[in-house]
Amino acid sequence: MIDSSSNNTYDVNESLKVENLTRDDYEEICKRLGRKPNRTELGMFGVMWSEHCCYRNSKPLLANFPTTGKNVLVGPGENAGVIDVGNDQKLVFKIESHNHPSAIEPFQGAATGVGGILRDIFTMGARPIAVLNSLRFGNLDKLSNISLLRGVVSGISHYGNCVGVPTVGGEIDFDDSYSGNPLVNVMALGLLETDEIVCSGAKEVGSPVLYVGNTTGKDGVGGASFASSELNTNSLDNRPAVQVGDPFIEKSLIEACLDAFKTGDVLSAQDMGAAGLTCSSAEMAANGSLGISINLDLVPARENDMSAYQYLLSESQERMLLVVKEEKLNTLINQFKKWGLFANVIGEVISRKEVIISQKNQIVAQIPTSALSDETPINIHNIIKEPPIHLLEKWEWTEEELPAISENKILSLKDQQKYSFSEIILKLLSNPSIASKSWVYRQYDSQVQSNTVFKPGDADAALIRLRRQDEKNKNNEFSGVAASVDCNSRWVLLDPYRGSIAAVAESARNVSCVGAQPIAITNNLNFSSPETEIGYWQLSSACDGISKACIALETPVTGGNVSLYNESKNQNNQVTPINPTPVIGMVGTIKNVDKAISSGWKNINDQIWIIGSNASESSIAASSYLEYFHDLVTGRPPKIHLQDEKYCQSFLRDSIQKNYIASSHDVSDGGLAVALSECCILSSKGAYIQLEEKNARQDNLLFSEGGSRILFSVNKKEEQNFLNFLEIKSKDFGRNVYVKKIGFVSEHNLDITLQDQTLCNLRVDELTEKFNNSISNCF
């Protein structure tokens, strides 16, 4: 029977606040248990019923995502998604957030974010091969934001570098909405090394439950509940809820677990991440439709005075829970100990569908697995039928409201000064959100494992060579996997539906720009409180947009993460929500990495082309130009025509495979002028561009965003072959897709003309200086 000692005597109302539970939750818990929970059990329900663990606010929305496809082997529900990437190889991938921990303890918060996502990958039987990250901070004119940036980057680089997994790419954006609540999203990829995918469901009644890895301490207690609440001026008091990681133990854990998985003697595996031992045991039992009994006296402890509550809610890092074959138990224990890891039998699989926890010869918790993991409560929200009035008003904005252009100069509404287009381009390149992130990339080891094809920043997507024992396939070539993380949160703020469609489209476009076929996505939905009408409408609209884009582009969702309550309160209780940020992690495949291309120009006199959609809009509404130069965040983001998007990307990939295209780069933040500048900077070559549009404003031509546009260069020697191919393929496009030549690669300058009128004349070294030094100059 359950222990009814002093553990059961506690202030219910105060404890509910601590566990972030409501009175209705408490009544439901009592109903499910048939009695009042003791304090330990209440803590277990607190973490398992948090948004972080059970998606109680978002689950109905996530159910609409497309999750199946010809390449999908494992979708949502397991530790990570798995897809078939050909050549008898399987890719495991997922994205997770560590936002709140990074806000109060940036180094450890970010470091353990890396460690946690790596465990999700190797728990499936895959060797981690790459990490990407998507980061958001407040503007760098505040010392507190600079400190957060330093700490987060240092934490990511420390853990990734020490554990030997390359950090190969990502994105970083800056906006005041993130000042009190930075976002740290980490995506990891792994290559399956076992014949069978290792799943989490417990198997075979009587099988030993083996605890493997680091010791359990008091760090991270209640971390899942902390991650599911808003940040305020007292959040620094929650530092104990932030875990402390050890990448060297993680490295040993990776190698030891992969060795053990290969034997087939591990029946199931679950990492101890959010909610620690509570979540791992409950999910393992529920996924196997069985139960688990745990004896806390057998858990390796860092301290002697730990309570059952602390054992169960600790999120100490580098720990795994395994169900193993009893006859192989001693062999496995010795194998793990050889790696310097703790390996203790702490329980067994039972037929009764309960999680039963004992300590000091007493049962301290006894809960049905369905109550903890399967039948978790869902918060029902009303979704407003129309966009908020303030957005409808912003959507009415048109470019006619901007100052007139006179003598190729325009008045900035930000500082009331007139600037030439050349000066505006330099300003945009110095915007930290657009500028080079080399200050960050230099701190990451991107080359460890020797499979990184492009250095971070050199191409639109990261590209990893897939190889086993250095053997090429029968065609004497290596296949590869491309990955990109993307989200324009300004677009999502102004239109969550269109902005989320654009995030999926851009991530696919970036993968296509290196020559890879987009296959599937993982997503990280970073939003503010779902308890406000606007907050939940943003989340719902974003999910609708992601679903539509994924269906159209045939890139199913294999899993991901939801991070809500990303907002901060100041001393006056004023709430600042983050810009809604649904980060899309796209993966794709390429048959031969030798055919992949990067973003910079390759040869003088190569022809510069652009492909895009006539049906999709391109506009300076919602653009970086409008925000950074005019201090305006307004207008409706351009619409993406998804069928045209598919045509554009397909044509590009086919042209790359035929070796017609030498470089490619998508047109995104900053528009055409910034995209051209980036290609020049990456290659140390110039470009001569002739624009012909007659009826558009010059700033629209230079800085508009959207339109599914991709900039690419064609090798002069391949131009006729390319033209012949274009003639054949253009029959598939219809009237909605255009492909046109706009210039050629030159030596030292970026020259942009419009009907013989010079809009821009800048030396490449000027562009490079602004682009490369913007972030480092903030320190």
From Swiss-Prot:
Signal peptide: none annotated. GO terms for cellular component: cytoplasm. It catalyses: N(2)-formyl-N(1)-(5-phospho-beta-D-ribosyl)glycinamide + L-glutamine + ATP + H2O = 2-formamido-N(1)-(5-O-phospho-beta-D-ribosyl)acetamidine + L-glutamate + ADP + phosphate + H(+). Belongs to the FGAMS family. This is Phosphoribosylformylglycinamidine synthase subunit PurL. The keyword Transport does not apply. Keywords: ATP-binding, Cytoplasm, Ligase, Magnesium, Metal-binding, Nucleotide-binding, Purine biosynthesis. Its EC number is 6.3.5.3. ATP binds at Y55, K94, N523, G560.
